[in-house]
Structures are given as C-alpha cells and as structure tokens.
C-alpha cells in the first residue's frame, strides 16, 4: 500500500489517537523497495508523531536491492537527529552472503558519530545461514569501545538448526568481561520442540555464575503443547535446587484445556510448596 488516511464517520480527516497523525504515506522505487515512509497531518504536511517523534524514514539501496542507508527525517524532509538514539541514520555494508557485516551510525551531515549506546560502528561476522558469530563495537575514532551493556564484543555459537547455544562477552582487550547484568555470557539447551530447556549465566571463566536473582542454572519443563509447566533453579553443579532472591526454588504452572494459565505453585529446595517473597 502507498497511503493510509484516517477518517471520521462523516469522511473528514481524523487523528490516530496513539500517534496524533492523519496520514501514512509510502514511496517505492521501480523495484518495489520502500524508499520513504512519511507521517503527515490532515493538510498533507509532514509532522512528528507522538510515539517516535520523527516525520519519516528514507532508505537508499544498492544495485543488489540491499538497503545501504536509512535516515530519519524531520518536518523539513531533511535528516533529523534523534537525541534518544544519538544519531540520524545508519549505513550498512553486506557480506558475500547478503547479510549485514557492518553498521555505521551517522549524524545529519552523514558523518560518523558516537551514539547513546556508546558506539559509532558495529561489525559482524556471520555464518552462511546468517547466524551472527561475532559482533564488535567501535567509537568514531575507530577504536574498540564498551557499549551501553559494558561489552566491546560478543562471540556466539549455534547448533545445527540455528538455535543460540552460547555467547560470551569481551572487553576492548578481547578478554571475557561481565556485562551490566553480571554475566560474561550465557549457555542454552533446547528440547525436541526447540524450546529452551536450560540456561546458565557464565562467569569470565566460562563456568556457571550467579545471576542478580542469585540463580546459577535454570531449567524449564514443557507439556506437549509447549506450555511451560515447571521452572526450577539450581546451583553451579546443576544437581541441587537452590533459592532465588524471592526465596523460591521454582514454580509449577497449571493450564486449562484451552492453554490458559489457571494456577501456579512455588516450591522450595525440598520440592515442597513454599511462600514466595516476590510477585510473578
């Protein structure tokens, strides 16, 4: 679609309550790629919606149809700096398989700039399936830097079907580092339905470490429909139940025939019912 107009019951221009705008307008190139997405008022003038605060987005494509630049637009139709993000646009580069391998954040003049996330450029290493094996963050001077999560890079591993099974965080010296959540990484296991059945926070030594919830390893059990029926917390050995910060070792969920959660019960390290200190 190229245009959406909000109207009252008598056919007069109306405002979308959530955004405060009247018209969404799209422009496409000859290949069907979205070039512009614009927000307009009832008079057809560009306006700033309530939720995102910009008048539109402009995309630029290369000969392969890949989006190489995305810019945020103001009411004058020119690039607009978004203070919340710390940039006005993003430039993309692609690897031989067509996956993004580099993103550069730019200001209204098209120059590289440091963002609110702490970096000016991100680089990616992808496998042939598009799984992101490595990601590194750089400032506008071209040096590795810590992002808002406190890491300079991430390395990840995936299983044969593309499930993330482990990632580790690294500092500017390529050494494992704890992020703002207190993890240097996480490890995951999956059941036959592809649902996460176990996850563990990792320390800089690659071994399970305690989360902010005071839990080392969390295990999940599901029914045949994929509903979570049990969540349990374990120590670093993975053999003993342990209490989290709320004073529970886990809980069990009960569902009705429609899959609606109708009850849950907390249990302690002895597997017996207990009182939780928190709200869930």
Cite the ranges covered by each PLM segment.
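Buried hydrophobic residues that stabilize the cores of well-folded domains
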Residues: 1-280
